[in-house]
Amino acid sequence: MENIKIIIASDSIGETAELVARACISQFNPKECKHEFLRYPYIETKEDIDEVIQVANDRNAIIVYTLVKPEMKTYMESKIGTNKLRSIDIMGPLMGYLKDAFEENPYNQPGRVHRLDDAYFKKIDAIEFAVKYDDGKDPKGLPKADIVLIGVSRTSKTPLSQYLAHKSYKVMNVPIVPEVTPPDMLFDIDSSKCIALRISEEKLNRIRKQRLKQLGLGDSARYANEIRIKEEIKYFEDIVDRIGCAVIDVSDKAIEETANDVINIIESQSK
């Protein structure tokens, strides 16, 4: 079977059209269904479209396009019809429906989805921060963090940090373990940005036993031992008292619930 040629034509970078095309292609056997992408980004003139049409004719290609400027879209449709080419307009039909539903004309500006604003960059910075300072890797992150989470192992510190990072908060988490003295800086930072994650002994015991099973280990390991858990929680409570920070009981809460509680505490304390 010959390679299917797919032209990606766009008045922006063409990412949207290519993602849709690749999603469709993924539904077919890659060994049997060979394909080739031909990219034509930043189409600005009718001459650019003429080139796309010429290549589509010469190579018997399918045109997958995203054009938001009405004059360019109309010209593309006209040339496709005249040349009887195979094509798909990725955005046009939905844009038409939305125009009617909103009773408002679209901006018709290429690349708007890629205009990265301050909020976007802030979120990316927060995500990178959460990865860099996960699990107390570097105490230098403590004064830079918007939120500092502390808790014993298996209190969802890492996933909670990532969830909050996607809401643009710079979060560092610090594990509390009896054998490891917390960094001095933890007691020097503003306690209002520190949140302690408390969990019941019973819940922690169940979670840790389940974790050991997943790892193919017996549940009698010290990690899930009741005496050990009591020791860890006692040490955790001592650290919390020393810091004087807010506490959230995560025993029966989903990540989303805990995140909302954290945000509410942080925002109320910043007022």
Swiss-Prot record:
Ranges that cross the membrane: none
Top-level taxon in the UniProt lineage: Bacteria
Keyword Hydrolase assigned: no
One Pfam entry name: Kinase-PPPase
Molecular-function annotations in GO: ADP binding; ATP binding; phosphotransferase activity, phosphate group as acceptor; protein serine/threonine kinase activity
Catalysed transformations (reactions): N(tele)-phospho-L-histidyl/L-threonyl-[pyruvate, phosphate dikinase] + ADP = N(tele)-phospho-L-histidyl/O-phospho-L-threonyl-[pyruvate, phosphate dikinase] + AMP + H(+); N(tele)-phospho-L-histidyl/O-phospho-L-threonyl-[pyruvate, phosphate dikinase] + phosphate + H(+) = N(tele)-phospho-L-histidyl/L-threonyl-[pyruvate, phosphate dikinase] + diphosphate
EC number(s) per entry: 2.7.11.32, 2.7.4.27
Keywords: Kinase, Nucleotide-binding, Serine/threonine-protein kinase, Transferase
Record-listed ADP binding positions: 151-158
Enzyme class: transferase
InterPro entries xrefs: Kinase-pyrophosphorylase, PPDK_reg
Function: Bifunctional serine/threonine kinase and phosphorylase involved in the regulation of the pyruvate, phosphate dikinase (PPDK) by catalyzing its phosphorylation/dephosphorylation.
Assigned protein family: Belongs to the pyruvate, phosphate/water dikinase regulatory protein family. PDRP subfamily.
NCBIfam families per UniProt: PRK05339.1
Protein name listed in UniProt: Putative pyruvate, phosphate dikinase regulatory protein 2
Organism: Staphylococcus haemolyticus (strain JCSC1435)
